[in-house]
Regions:
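N-terminal, active-site-proximal structural segment of metallo-dependent hydrolase catalytic domains
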Residues: 1-47, 57, 62
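Short, flexible loop segments at the rims of nucleotide/cofactor-binding pockets, characterized by
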Residues: 6-13, 79-80, 118-120
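Nucleotide phosphate-binding site architecture
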Residues: 12, 74, 136
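Glycine-rich, phosphate-binding/catalytic loops in enzymes
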Residues: 20-23, 47-50, 85, 118-119
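Structured beta-strand-rich core segments of catalytic domains in phosphoester-bond hydrolases
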Residues: 37, 43-111
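Binuclear metal-dependent hydrolase catalytic cores centered on His/Asp/Glu-rich metal-binding motifs
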Residues: 114-126
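Single conserved hydrophobic/aromatic residue that forms the stacking wall/gate
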Residues: 127-137
């Protein structure tokens, strides 16, 4: 199984710079992206043979994760189940027979470490929910 993970820093911008061609050439079974910075329906990207799963931030143009899969997962979960963390579209979990793929976009601590406390709290929360899983992305 071929897994790809890519922080695109804005999927709409990447689509104008060869992302679709790279996606096709890599021919992954599961293609995970982080920092999509978009809401569903904002980009025309529907690769043939793949099913898309997305998790967008409530704030438009911010964060977000997505996966394209050749084989549908058993289950898809968005977020980590904690309201204080689940508004930024950072964690998309796919369950397959024998493994979980956790596609996550970790918060940046920002200049001057303004969000360091939040990031540390977020990481502890992610570790708590991921104990029974194997982090792949």
């Amino acid at each position: 199984m071929k897994l790809i993970s890519w922080n695109v820093n804005g999927l709409r911008a990447c689509l104008t710079h060869g992302f679709a061609e790279s996606f096709a050439a890599l021919d992954a079974d599961i293609f995970s992206v982080q920092e999509t910075k978009m809401q569903p329906g904002q980009a025309d990207f529907a690769p043939e043979g793949y099913t898309e799963y997305t998790y967008s931030a409530e704030k438009k143009g911010y964060s977000g994760t997505a996966c394209w899969c050749k084989t549908a997962p058993l289950a898809v979960t968005t977020g980590i189940g904690l309201e204080q963390h689940d508004h930024e579209g950072r964690v998309l979990t796919l369950e397959y027979p024998g493994f979980y793929l956790v596609n996550c976009y970790t918060p940046n601590s920002q200049d001057g470490l303004k969000r360091l406390d939040y990031r540390m709290e977020w990481e502890l929360s992610l570790i708590h929910i991921s104990e029974p899983t194997r982090l792949l992305s």
